[in-house]
Amino acid sequence: MNYELVFLAAGQGKRMNAQKNKMWLELVGEPIFIHALRPFLADNRCSKVIVVCQEEERKHVKELMSQLNVAEHRIEIVKGGSERQYSVAAGLERCGTGRVVLVHDGARPFITLDIIDRLLIGVEQSKAAICAVKVKDTVKRVMNGVVQETVDRENLWQVQTPQAFELPILRKAHQLARKEQFLGTDEASLVERIPCPVAIVQGSYYNIKLTTPEDMPLAKAILGELGGIAND
C-alpha cells in the first residue's frame, strides 16, 4: 500500500534550550531531521514527502534533500503554522489523491519499517491507526501539587507517531476541528471526534520524542543499540 507522508519539522524546540530548531541538532554526526526522515525515504511505498517547516528554514531543507539525492518530484516543502495542528493542515493541503497519509513528528528519529508495516495493516483494516506502547510507570492525577488519585494504567497507552489515516478521514477531522475551534495534541484526537474508531498498533519504547536536553544522551544510546541490532 502506497502512502504520502506529512513530516513535521516546524517546531521551535524551546524546551531543548537550543539556539536553533532541534531538527538541526546533530545526533552522531547527522541532524535529527535526517535520522527521522531516512526510513521513509528508504520505503518505496512512500510516494511523496511533504516537509512542513519554518519559512526561513526552507532553503536549508532543500539543501539537505539535495545532499540525500532525493528526487524533486518526491518532496514538497510547505510553511508550517503557529500550532502543530495548523502545520498538519498545511501539509494535508498538498497531499494528492492517494488513499493513505502518515503524519510523523520530525523529533522522533527512531522509527522503523516494522512500525510502518504495522500501521499500514492497521489503517487498511480500520481507516485510522496509531502506534503506541503500554504505560510502564504508575500514573497519578495531581492538582495544586497534591495527589488526587492513582490512575489505573491497565488501559493506558503512550501514543507515538507516525499516525496513519485514510486521507479523506483526516481531512474531514481537520475540517470539523476548524469549524468547532478544537485544538488537539495529535491527529487521532481529531479523528476520534468525527467519530471514527482509531486502532492501536504496537510502537516501540525506542521511538522517543526528543524534547529536552536530557533526551540527547538517551538518543545516542538508542542509536548505538539500534546500530548494533542492525549489524548483528
From Swiss-Prot:
Site entry: Transition state stabilizer: 15, 22
Highest taxon of the lineage: Bacteria
Record keywords: Isoprene biosynthesis, Nucleotidyltransferase, Transferase
GO molecular function: 2-C-methyl-D-erythritol 4-phosphate cytidylyltransferase activity
Pfam families the UniProt entry points to: IspD
Enzyme Commission number(s) of this protein: 2.7.7.60
Enzyme's top EC category: transferase
Site entry (Positions MEP for the nucleophilic attack), positions: 153, 209
GO biological process: isopentenyl diphosphate biosynthetic process, methylerythritol 4-phosphate pathway
The protein's annotated pathway: Isoprenoid biosynthesis; isopentenyl diphosphate biosynthesis via DXP pathway; isopentenyl diphosphate from 1-deoxy-D-xylulose 5-phosphate: step 2/6
Catalysed reactions, as listed in the record: 2-C-methyl-D-erythritol 4-phosphate + CTP + H(+) = 4-CDP-2-C-methyl-D-erythritol + diphosphate
Family, as annotated: Belongs to the IspD/TarI cytidylyltransferase family. IspD subfamily.
Function: Catalyzes the formation of 4-diphosphocytidyl-2-C-methyl-D-erythritol from CTP and 2-C-methyl-D-erythritol 4-phosphate (MEP).
Identification of the protein by name: 2-C-methyl-D-erythritol 4-phosphate cytidylyltransferase
Naturally occurring in which organism (per UniProt): Listeria monocytogenes serovar 1/2a (strain ATCC BAA-679 / EGD-e)
Gene: ispD
